[in-house]
């Protein structure tokens, strides 16, 4: 599945790669965003979450050399991927314990003033837990936006009430 081409998302990924952001957290284990950076000859760092393994050292990311971070593993390291419910539980435990996510990445998330969530399945129970964890110590005045025209009213209300995420009723390509 992850090895096949997705020509419909390539223009969107090219646009995302051009954004001046220091961190891009991907919620898929594929390397499509990484390929978009390579195709445009942009400088970047790449890392991925590997449950229950010590975080690798990374340099503090900048807009000129951002960090691309695959939170659900990497397709080239199958054992890092979240493929089953058991993998999901191990992943969540690993994230909650905070041992396998780089200190530099945590500091970047906590210091960030802007977050853009694109295409995340906020209706899934584990996504709510994950967003809570990722933003629990983050700057409370940070602007947080989510683009997805398919959110139902209940999910939008939860996102606004619980996480102060502003839902933008636009298709992802229009939002970017």
Enumerate the language-model features and the residues they cover.
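Short hydrophobic-aromatic micro-motifs
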Residues: 26, 68-71, 116-117
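SIR2/sirtuin-family catalytic core signature
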Residues: 19-22, 40-43, 56-65, 99-176
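Active-site periphery "cap/insert" segments of enzyme catalytic domains
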Residues: 1-60, 78, 114, 124
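A diffuse structural propensity rather than consistent per-protein peaks
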Residues: 7-10, 84, 152
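Active-site metal-binding loops of divalent metal-dependent hydrolases
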Residues: 29, 73, 120
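Active-site gating loop/helix substructures
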Residues: 42-110
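Polar/charged alpha-helical tracts
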Residues: 11-14, 18, 90, 94, ...
